[in-house]
UniProtKB/Swiss-Prot annotation:
Protein encoded by which gene: truB
Keywords: Isomerase, tRNA processing
Protein name: tRNA pseudouridine synthase B
EC number: 5.4.99.25
Primary enzyme class: isomerase
Biological process annotations from GO: mRNA pseudouridine synthesis; tRNA pseudouridine synthesis
Function: Responsible for synthesis of pseudouridine from uracil-55 in the psi GC loop of transfer RNAs.
Catalytic activity entry: uridine(55) in tRNA = pseudouridine(55) in tRNA
């Protein structure tokens, strides 16, 4: 008779990992899940194996709110090598084209405004986007190119940091769904020399503080102490995933109704509408709801209440 599968801990929160280079986001997420002995985990937007930086990992009930971090703005620092294009638009790919680089700082500064604002971007073939149920990168590795539709993105800011030819370093503040490799490839084409990513670091997701990140080596040192309570001190609260939403505090009666998934009519002196994060009369995070124009709270995503 097979032994019952061991269940992890019911631990909830968000761990801010400084992802190491060379590991996939899913692989490192599974490692973090094992370190915390969590029963459930999910990351909030994959980073390429080449990339490092902020990777929020949601544990337990926090996985219910991971979509809010997937949808959040991101910030990156990227270094590109001008003069070479690769099939993946980064240093892990094969060089497919080499050109002379006759670009100076003024050329770069003149080009950057063309890549700020609302843009349409065609995703790279080397992406996890799916076509007929299969990731695009599987087609790409088989030498098959699939027609991709351009998708709307927003580059809120694109700043020049340094240029030591042929290496260009930029800072990017962008919307969800932005492929930095594609942005660099497009910029290289605009400059007439081609380019690919050599270094990519995610510096921010939503409003999470950089100083709250922990690298993998430090986490392993903590894990070796076999003190779960010590590890748990490094988790951010579940509601941090939705901190961009306005908070709505409920009384005891309202809290109880919401916890059962019921809609609640309430006095709304501030005329608050749209998505909100809900807190009980005891300051417990209840979840996310929608306040409609009739001052009715409609639950959307709720924490599981212990009974």
């Amino acid at each position: 008779m097979a032994k019952p599968r061991k269940r992890g801990r019911d631990i909830d929160g968000v761990f801010l990992l400084d992802k190491p280079q060379g590991m996939s986001s899913n692989d490192i997420m599974q490692k973090v899940k094992r370190v915390f002995q969590a029963n459930k985990a999910g990351h909030t937007g994959a980073l390429d194996p080449l990339a490092t930086g902020m990777l929020p990992i949601c544990l337990g009930e926090a996985t219910k709110f991971s979509q809010f971090l997937l949808d959040a703005d991101k910030r990156y620092q990227v270094t590109a090598k001008l003069g070479e294009r690769t099939d993946t638009s980064d240093a892990e790919g094969q060089v497919v084209e080499t050109r002379d680089v006759q670009v100076d700082v003024q050329d770069i500064l003149a080009a950057l405004p063309h890549f700020r604002g609302n843009l349409m971007q065609v995703p790279t073939m080397f992406s996890a986007l799916k076509h007929q149920g299969k990731p695009l990168y599987e087609y790409a590795r088989a030498g098959i190119t699939v027609e991709r539709e351009a998708r709307p993105i927003t580059i809120f800011d694109l700043q020049f940091i340094a240029y030591d030819a042929p290496y260009l370093t930029l800072e990017v503040h962008c919307s969800k769904g932005t492929y930095i490799r594609t942005l660099v490839d497009d910029l290289g084409e605009y400059l007439g020399c081609g380019a690919h990513v050599t270094v990519l670091r995610r510096t921010a997701v939503a409003n999470y503080p950089v100083e709250a990140m922990m690298n993998w080596d430090t986490l392993q040192v903590l894990a070796a102490q076999q003190d779960l309570a010590l590890l748990d001190q490094h988790l951010l609260p579940t509601d941090s995933a939705v901190s961009a939403l306005p908070a709505l505090h409920l009384n005891q009666e309202q809290s109880k109704a919401i916890s059962f998934g019921q809609r609640v009519k309430f006095d709304n002196p501030t005329q608050l509408t749209g998505q909100v994060r809900l807190f009980s009369d005891t300051q417990q995070f209840l979840g996310v709801a929608l306040v409609d124009e009739h001052n009715v709270i409609r639950p959307q995503r709720l924490m599981t209440q212990n009974t």
